[in-house]
Amino acid sequence: MNDSNVEAPDKATFEQRFCSRAWNEEGKKVAQIDARHPGDIGLWDYDYWIQGQDYVHLSFRNVRVVSIENHQTARVKLILHNGEDVPLELKMVKEQGLWRIDDLTDAANPLGIRATQAQYIRENP
């Protein structure tokens, strides 16, 4: 288990460093749509990385790779704790020899963050 009492890292910096190109391109489109509606909450009313609005006492456990396909994609499951236990699944892709997060599935987004973002982009041309 890892614990952190520090502030949440900047989301954009985190995603640029650890997420796939496709994830980041989609995230930029979502940010552009949200910027057209100042004062509105936008697509995300919580931080999916910490599974809440506030960074309490973040930890994770039971991190396990459940599948690897063609040495290019993998699925990872873990339990995130930020006030309560939340099961998460990450889809990983290999880009330029490094594993990057390509999607995150949680209870609010059973089809994944990327599917939710893609729908939001389609609905807000």
Model-predicted segments: where are they?
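Surface-exposed, charged secondary-structure patches
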Residues: 15-84
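Acidic side chains
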Residues: 47, 102-103
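Short, aromatic-enriched amphipathic alpha-helices that serve as compact interaction elements
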Residues: 1-5, 9
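Low-complexity, intrinsically disordered terminal/linker segments enriched in charged
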Residues: 36-37, 67-89, 95-96, 103-125
